[in-house]
Design a protein with these regions (language model features):
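Intrinsically disordered, low-complexity segments enriched in serine, threonine, and glycine
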Residues: 79-220
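Residue-level signal for secondary-structure boundary sites
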Residues: 7-9, 71-73, 134
Length: 220
């Protein structure tokens, strides 16, 4: 990294950046380096600064990066909306208070195709929104079901990589409901690539974000 400007300005910029690196380590939450639409999660282990070899009024910073999961990730998200009456009628909107605002009109719900352009199956996050009871989703023959009741403004998050299932109550309380997953087919089964058939009863909405992983990002 090369910093330009007056000496005091360069010092301030390096201090600010170092504070960000230190915060990631202290909170045990990796930061992200982006290349186009891909990112890799990492920590900055060490920093060295020196006078730039291009101009002596610039400062170079050399950083040592540690990637606990050394894969570049591109996220692909699709929302699956509930059918208001269960008969494919048009409905107006659902408004959730946690930045997942629905505002749409749509015909039948319950079966959708989703094309995932990748060379392998992918880990995912799945967010299931209430109100609903024992939500069940079929993806290419695999069953993803949680035996739990969700009220309005509650939702469940499934993380296939971390193997976690968390319920968020309307008041912001988080509950670990791992033990409420269905047995048999795994709710953590990776989602295959290609033309994917997704089926459910159409009575609730959910989002799926697949994590398309590569050892190096695609050249954009």
């Amino acid at each position: 990294l090369t910093f330009r400007g007056k000496l005091e300005e360069r010092k301030a910029m390096m201090d600010e950046l170092t504070n960000c690196f230190e915060f990631d380590i202290a909170s045990l939450k990796p930061g992200r380096i982006w290349f186009g639409t891909y990112y890799i999660e990492c920590y900055i282990k060490s920093i060295e600064s020196s006078v730039s070899g291009i101009r002596n009024s610039w400062t170079d910073m050399t950083i040592d990066i540690y990637c606990p999961y050394p894969m570049w990730i591109e996220e692909l998200t699709k929302s699956f909306y509930p059918d208001a009456s269960g008969k494919g009628e048009i409905y107006e909107y659902l408004d959730y208070p946690y930045d997942h605002t629905y505002d749409f009109s749509k015909t039948a719900a319950g079966t959708e195709h989703w094309y995932i352009d990748h060379y392998k199956s992918s880990n995912f996050w799945m967010i299931i929104y209430g109100p609903c009871a024992d939500p069940k989703i079929m993806i290419e023959g695999n069953t993803y079901q949680i035996f739990e009741t969700l009220e309005k403004n509650e939702y469940i998050t499934i993380d296939s990589q971390k193997k976690t299932i968390v319920k968020m109550l309307a008041n912001g309380t988080e509950q670990n409901i791992f033990y409420k997953k269905a047995t048999g087919n795994s709710v953590f089964e990776e989602i295959p690539a290609g033309d994917v058939l997704v089926s459910w009863n159409g009575e609730f909405g959910f989002d799926i974000t697949v994590r398309k992983e590569r050892s190096v990002p695609e050249w954009i």
